[in-house]
């Protein structure tokens, strides 16, 4: 697994190393990019002889190329400011001129970053649109500076064409090569132009014997050779390529072969695996296999995978097939017959046979080599099986899952004393009953929590009719006790003993209210109004696991009508109580930081382009600032 991890890391790392010198996009609000733009704009304003300076409006594009030298290439938009060229102000201290009269422009620049974090301009082209007038183009090129240019620049066309012709004319390769991809290009202004280009070449289907130079019918071969070249060209002032040199590295292609002619008597040819031509050759092959094999049973050809024939001084057959063990033994059968059936779990062989036949001499020379196929590993392991993924089967411990109602029933049988004596429950829950009827029946009973689960059991409390539980609201602290206390479906007074009246009416009953920091409404319905309570008691010999949700029959007890009515409800297998007194309420706003989820993976940083528009500082005229307070008198402030 460690080896696989290392290989994956290397596969991710190698492309990144190969692309180290490629241009990387930058955020248009990047500080270092702004410094480069500042240098370029100051250089442009310094070249103006009259008029106003230009102020940065917005950076629209930005790339960075790291290598032996670091270059910044970017585009930015400018607007005419209200500071003159001779004012001595920097462009940051100027405001925009009125939009109707102001000139606008866009500049494309390439700057080199030096070791002292200073920038030098390699090239800059600005297209200026006056407020009223045609576009004016201003170009600047650093004399003697080698700087990158666009690989799509039209000026590279003649240089690249000459580079490919130079390679084809000075190599001994049998085929012509064509231009693949231009990876980078640099230019230097001298008494002419120097170019440094890195490009790839690919082999075409045109041979040098048939084509003296590249033709429009020459297309790159998918599996042909390719290479990468570095070329240096010099173009004089007359736009003529006066010098060129290159160095290339070759990468051989995969599965490169020449197509054989259709009529080739001595060449191997593929034949169908079900061709009748193979019948005799297959017969000799299986006979040779059974003769050389010491196995007690005969083998029979099951599948022919591929076959070729070649005309030599006779015919040579090369066949690959799979042979399987049959039920016919060599002791009881003199030879293999067609009615011999193969064994379902018999041995299988992967065989390669060479059969040389000379019919006019009745000469047959078969040669068979076989390898045993391990069928057991194929049967036991599914496709894609890996020993690293073999599951470890862990025998689970024997345990018994017991539901709360079953625990109560067992406790009754083990401790009969609980049936008669009162059980004091400390259910610290005071609920306010909202009654919809004048008479509401209350039942004192011993059940699980509050309500009648069984006539006797753990806990006790009042039981209300199911129809009267449509509106309930809980006031006060809702204290939960972990052992034998709590409330179930029925809500009532948790204090008291398990003795009381069978029936009583209480129309105007005042319940004691307890002030609480929270008021939580409890919604109940006549159809589904069951809240399960986990009861922890004496359960020696049982292992309590969270059971699956299962229906529980809840008895409403004997009413005045004299019959028992059962209600089926779904009981939650887990404790639905929440210890609100231990966990404080945290009110979270939807837009707050705590409400937002944290991603498992870091978000990909997106490059923001174009950048934020520049907001110049309004520069006021000093004369106006002094005249604003010229009429101020100190006596006015003292009066």
Curated annotation (Swiss-Prot):
Protein name: Kininogen-1
Domain Cystatin kininogen-type: 28-132, 151-254, 273-376
Glycosylation sites recorded in the entry for this protein: 82, 169, 205, 294, 529
Residue numbers bearing the Phosphoserine modification: 332
Keyword Protein transport: no
A cellular-component GO term for this protein: extracellular space
Biased composition regions of type Basic and acidic residues, renumbered to the chain: 503-519
